[in-house]
Amino acid sequence: LADSGHNLRCMICDRKDAYAFERARKLGIKTYYVSYYKRDREEAEKDICSILEAENIQLVVLAGFMRLLTPYLVDRFRNRIMNIHPALLPKHPGTHGIPDSYNSEDRELGITIHYVDYGMDSGPVIVQKSFERDFTESIEEIEEKIHKLEHIHYPETIKKVLDELDSQHQRG
């Protein structure tokens, strides 16, 4: 996204020890830690919404965030929260997308980039990318192929969605 004309304003994480903090700081990106510990989800997400609104965030991009969002957050950023999932939804939703795909008889495996709604990996699909499976490959080889697709297509899709949001904003 560095050459896209869009700014990554901040990174919010719910895991204090996440490597993402170090990576963001090295890139000069503002970081925030929001704890869910001994709090209900909506309470934590009120803090997240306050940050997103203060930073004037146009698009929320999830990566490695393994929680369902509450209606409180989803409603405030409807069709402006993206997630990436390491399986071809609607097959294999949830936290085990890669092993579930690997253990299936699916001939095609891949990724889904989608908007977030109230359900688990159930929001409108933005894009899916896939490859034909070789049943002799190990789970590690499949995982590598899936991550390669993620690293190529998530930034491309984020840029495309931001460009569309900019275009809508300019029109009115």
Please provide the spans of the model-predicted regions.
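Conserved acidic residues
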Residues: 9, 58, 79
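Residue-level detector of anion-binding/catalytic polar loops
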Residues: 30, 58, 107
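Short, conserved SAM-binding/catalytic segment
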Residues: 25-33
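Short beta->alpha connector loops at strand-helix junctions that form conserved
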Residues: 32-37, 84
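Donor/substrate-binding cores of folate-linked one-carbon enzymes
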Residues: 4-6, 14, 63-169
